[in-house]
């Protein structure tokens, strides 16, 4: 894989933030309120998987992964 630019890394980090926000909003009942439990669970599971993959990448510099790791833990404990 080619080296990522700083802009590409920033885009990945922003996308991770979107996953964090969505996981937290679903758990708080602020997102997907009209969806059934299976859809909410699937969405949380997919976003947790995305975060797990991205946190493990070796191209990160000084980016703070605290929110991502917290969302992973919260999502793993979530049952819709």
Model-predicted segments: where are they?
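Short intrinsically disordered terminal tails
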Residues: 1-4, 38, 70-80
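N-terminal acidic leader/helix
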Residues: 3-28
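A general marker of short, structured functional hotspots
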Residues: 8-9, 46, 55, 74
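N-terminal start and proteolytic maturation junction detector
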Residues: 12, 24, 56, 70-72
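Intrinsic disorder/low-complexity segments
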Residues: 14, 28-31, 49, 53, ...
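Short amphipathic alpha-helical heptad-repeat segments
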Residues: 15-22, 36, 40-52, 68
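Charged, low-complexity interaction regions
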Residues: 20, 31-39, 55-66, 80
């Amino acid at each position: 894989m080619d080296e990522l630019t700083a802009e590409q890394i920033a885009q990945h980090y922003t996308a991770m933030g979107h996953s964090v926000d969505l996981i937290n909003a679903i758990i708080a009942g602020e997102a997907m309120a009209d969806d059934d439990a299976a859809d909410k669970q699937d969405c949380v599971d997919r976003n947790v998987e995305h975060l797990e993959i991205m946190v493990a990448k070796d191209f990160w510099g000084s980016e703070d992964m605290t929110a991502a790791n917290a969302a992973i833990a919260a999502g793993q404990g979530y049952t819709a």
